[in-house]
Amino acid sequence: MALASDPPKAGFRLSMLIYDTRFRSITIQIVVLLLFLAGLVWLLNNAYVNLEAKGKDFNFSFLWTRAGYDLAQTLIPYSNDDTHFRALIEGLLNTLLVSVLGCILATILGTIIGVLRLSQNWLVARIMTVYVETFRNIPLLLWILLMGTILAETRPVPKDFRLTEAMKAAGEEPKASMWFFDSVAVTNRGTNLPAPAFDHSLGVVDLGWNLPVSLNALAILAVMSASFWGWRRFMARAKAVQEATGTRPTTWWPSLLILFAPISALLYGLGFHLDYPQITKFDFTGGFQMLHSFTALLIALTLYTAAFIAEIVRAGIQAISRGQTEAAYALGLRPGRTMSLVILPQALRVIVPPLISQFLNLTKNSSLAIAVSYMDLRGTLGGITLNQTGRELECMLLMMLIYLTISLTISSLMNLYNKSIKLKER
């Protein structure tokens, strides 16, 4: 209830949008937003007018037309009679494959190098420093080209692995030999590796859109998941017993039994074995071949990104108070156990945020795969499909949207992990 002595409230005036500090910030934000929207509309209209002048329209119907080109490495069934959309999916899967493997390998290698950079051994520390400074100060594209050239030019041709009857009679050996008990052959065409095979099959289920999935693989995945869940329950129970009685029960052999006995029994029942590559007259048959384009890209991405991750790990370790190390030594922990149980767990809070940026950089840097003819998203959608259809704007926008989605997904997952390891405070 207003009192008679209260001063009358001034009414709203348009001048208050500029001179009144309560409204000025809102006015500025609205003006900036309107200018941004006006600029966006102008750009879109300009693109539409230019496309119309060239007799083009803006649509994505080209994705459902026949692709007409083959891909050397595919993770799902694909032929040149499939659509450009399926080629896009294949390129996306290839991108995700090299990105996920690259992030895992670069993290492992970078962590090792980061720890070794702090080694008390002068030679080891200097070697790691040379590695870091060398790899992170040379452009990634050059490393990719170098790895591709080394693999293509220094490895023997497949026929050099063949042992002919004349060579047997003369007691000669082939010019090249396989590695790891004659199971791996690295040629100038690719790396031939043993492939998993089964004597018995549970069948194949079609998920639709020509995506067959082996029931053997689903059964293996289900058993592994159940074993892992059972092991987690067992370890939780062991921890509860330790907290209640002060004595920790034996866990190593039950853990091995829970984790490996079920999957071993399943693999034995399915007749699991390895299909080894065999040399024929001109090339290898059996097993599977990993193309050098994929190998060169993966090695280059791993070594390059690991150099940056090593510096992040080193900085994270140095951020931990030296008193933590001294306290661990006082408790009788050895240096290795101190690093794994005391220092690194605390350093993760410092390491993870910049590590997210390196994962994002590696994923985006994988678009350089076209340099060694690896058919990722850039090679399919942004390469052959773009050239065949002439849909430059649509292809570029799609690629930008896909890479944005991948990056936001990685960032969200890593932020969730970072939140889970944060120091819990009241």
UniProtKB/Swiss-Prot annotation:
GO terms for cellular component: ATP-binding cassette (ABC) transporter complex. It comes from Rhodobacter capsulatus (strain ATCC BAA-309 / NBRC 16581 / SB1003). Signal peptide: none annotated. It comes from the Bacteria. The gene is bztB. This is Glutamate/glutamine/aspartate/asparagine transport system permease protein BztB. One of its GO terms (biological process) is amino acid transport. Part of a binding-protein-dependent transport system for glutamate, glutamine, aspartate and asparagine. Probably responsible for the translocation of the substrate across the membrane. It is found in: Cell inner membrane. Pfam families: BPD_transp_1.
